[in-house]
Amino acid sequence: MRKQSNRLLSQEDHLPRQLTTFVGRSQEIAEITSLLAEPTCRLLTLVGMGGSGKTRLALETAARLGPQFPDGVYFAPLQAVPSPELLTPAIADALDLTLTGHDEPQIQLLNYLRDRTLLLILDNLEQLLLPPPLYPKR
């Protein structure tokens, strides 16, 4: 069930459905596509001002590249994850991976990912990696 724009994505994509048409940004999509095609690319970070469309750009690019990742494309929304300790379970949830009590969660996640070729979007990861502000928010 794919359409080039205004698509409703199938479950195999593991991406949120986009109900609006994606317009423009072909240069950015081409650059991201090129970088992800590099065999040495294990991590790609999109940076920009909040609200500039990084998430939508990542989702559109992932949807277009889906067939190049035989084990799928996944989206892990991390804005609601309150602490770094909960990062691994949040990623596992996005991957539909059930963590058991046998090994450490991080080990289970790494073992799961090790032999797979997939694209994983970690949205809002930076909020879990940055130190807390020195002053309280008002």
Predicted regions and their residues:
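Walker A/P-loop phosphate-binding element recognition
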Residues: 3-129, 136-138
